Swiss-Prot record:
Compositionally biased spans, kind Basic residues: 85-94, 107-142
Taxonomic lineage: Eukaryota, Metazoa, Chordata, Craniata, Vertebrata
UniProt-listed Pfam families: zf-CCHC_3
Biased composition (Basic and acidic residues): 66-84
Name by which UniProt lists this protein: Protein SREK1IP1
Gene induction: Down-regulated in the brains of Alzheimer disease patients.
Organism of provenance: Homo sapiens (Human)
Subunit architecture: Interacts with SREK1/SFRS12.
Gene Ontology biological-process entries: mRNA processing; RNA splicing
């Protein structure tokens, strides 16, 4: 039947390398069992080897390259934002020099004069249209009034 020493409570799945039940063998990164017969466990993070030094150097180089790239990207973003701000300032800026004031006042006068001319042309064209309508009405009235006047004279 069941083996007396193999209860579910007493047997627990764990790491075969270090014996720690908190993780499985493929997840073991921190500890190594020095002697499989004894319960002595060695912390890998406290030990150093030549391979790890080389790996650390490579990691440091890679991290430095990544930091440089990130810094360059940030600088580019800052420059672009500064350029945008400069463009906005140029658009908003109004110049206060006397020559530009004269130019702007001349331009304003010219625009005002153009608007007045357009208004005059529109009003003239409207007047012309009204005159034509009035002439047509007068002609109709003359034609209609002449027979009426003749009718009154006949009676």
């Amino acid at each position: 039947m069941a083996v007396p020493g193999c209860n579910k409570d007493s047997v627990r799945a764990g790491c075969k390398k270090c014996g720690y039940p908190g993780h499985l063998t493929f997840e073991c990164r921190n500890f190594l069992r020095v002697d499989p017969k004894r319960d002595i466990v060695l912390d890998v993070s406290s030990t150093s080897s030549e391979d790890s030094d080389e790996e650390n150097e490579e990691l440091n180089k890679l991290q430095a390259l990544q930091e440089k790239r990130i810094n360059e990207e940030e600088e580019k973003k800052k420059e672009k934002s500064k350029e945008k701000i400069k463009l906005k300032k140029k658009r908003k800026r109004s110049y206060s020099s006397s020559s530009t004031e004269e130019d702007t006042s001349k331009q304003k006068k010219q625009k005002y004069q153009k608007k007045e001319k357009k208004k005059e042309k529109k009003s003239k064209s409207k007047k012309g249209k009204h005159h034509k309508k009035e002439k047509k009405k007068r002609k109709k009235e003359k034609h209609s009034s002449t027979p009426n006047s003749s009718e009154f004279s006949r009676k």
